[in-house]
């Protein structure tokens, strides 16, 4: 089903990451999970709806000189395969922390999700979910951190999935993003907007701690999920049972359930 696209005052689309001719909030509605996945500018994504019902997704996106910011709402639980463009960092802030799985692990409370560009990652999110995202050029973030005197371990950050952060600083950044991405918001000074967001983000990174735990089983789970999808699509005219899938995949019911 086609997406419904709207801009406050114009219908001009974005041509390339972080290089739009307008600095206005772009809002898109979709009624199919995979259609919704393709609405985020210049990301490589695919979504699988994992709960029954009629899907509704909303994306509000703002392009700034060196930064992309967005709010994403999804009505049903989905599994997301995501990859942002190279030489960037993505930071994700679920509105309600503790409900998100990234690469198979529960993010937990008071956290910031992190992944570098050109690196595929997986999110599993529940129904009625809201997440705010920031994508920023790596060199711009490094330069801003140097100018502000922030002490950030970049090697750790590049391999991180989850950061434990100060709740007050996290709430401040969430509120700033919400204000900037409101339907009626007009960005009259994109450089100022970007600087405000950078300051709030650096305050979060400067006081945060990278969670060093990494899910070693993520790649295996990816392979099992991919094979299960292939089997289901190959037998679209019949409903495969869980025991049949387990037999074909050579895994236990418990292992299969964990993967999903």
What is each PLM-predicted segment?
Residues 50-84:
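Conserved short histidine dyad/triad with adjacent acidic residue
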Residues 55-57, 86, 118, 129:
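Short beta-strand-initiation
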Residues 61, 69-71, 90-91, 112-114, ...:
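Conserved hydrophobic/aromatic beta-strand scaffold that supports enzyme active sites
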Residues 82-85, 125-127:
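Short glycine/proline-enriched turns and hinge-like loops at secondary-structure junctions
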Residues 256-260:
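Short hydrophobic/aromatic patch on the recognition helix
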